[in-house]
Amino acid sequence: MKIKSIVLSFFLVIFFSVYAFAGDPATGGTGLTVAVAANVQYTFEEIKAAFEKNTGIVITPVTGSSGKFTAQIENGAPFDVFLSADMDYPQTLEKEGFTYNSPKVYGYGTLVIWTMTGVDLSRGIEGLTDSAVKKIAIATPKTAPYGRQAVNAFKHYNVYSQVQNKLVYGESIAQTNQFVTTKAADVGITAKSIVLAPNMKDQGKWVEINKEAYDTIAQGVVILKHAQKDHSEEAQKFFDFLFSNEAQGIFKKYGYELPVKAQP
């Protein structure tokens, strides 16, 4: 128990030190710390580069599951902006008084089945009941919206009871992807934005899951009250940038469907 406490304290010190260096006006920093849902990880690299080039404002992204970020924000984590994998988590934070503005949808996500093995994907989700498929990776449904929608898709096709014992859970989409790329799982249910990333698009094979099989994945962004301490102007600039033609074009490139008014 003592070792665990020491390790946790160590990582907290590192996190807060990085944050302080990036954003403390006393050090001349003008940075933003942004909580980024794991499905946006690769997309965000281009968003970050474009924003920093346009404004000179430095962004420090932290990637993880939306549910865990929400819990961290509720417990005082110093994030300025939160890009969630759904609207539920940022709306919850708004109701609890942790946000500066109301959440806004920046894009709509798509589920895909992805494999690095010889598994036949021609039958889609129904094919995952085959005995050749031993392990199926999904993000943890409790904290990851993409994991919840994967379960909804299984239930839509009436195969959940047949695949339930095959499921292995990643803490977020990022760990789910690791299970796929290392072949620790035969297939994984992940985000289309991942398989379209430049460093992933030629790896393995994938198919989309029919959107009628799961709830619409509306992904929201919100400015958090913490930003008002030192970075209100920078946070607003970044929030607005996400809905610019340039940023929305990047989201589209990575397979996100765009809000109607944000079509570039």
Feature locations, PLM:
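Short, glycine-/small- and polar/acidic-enriched structural segments
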Residues: P103-L111
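Bacterial N-terminal signal peptides that target proteins for export
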Residues: M1-F10
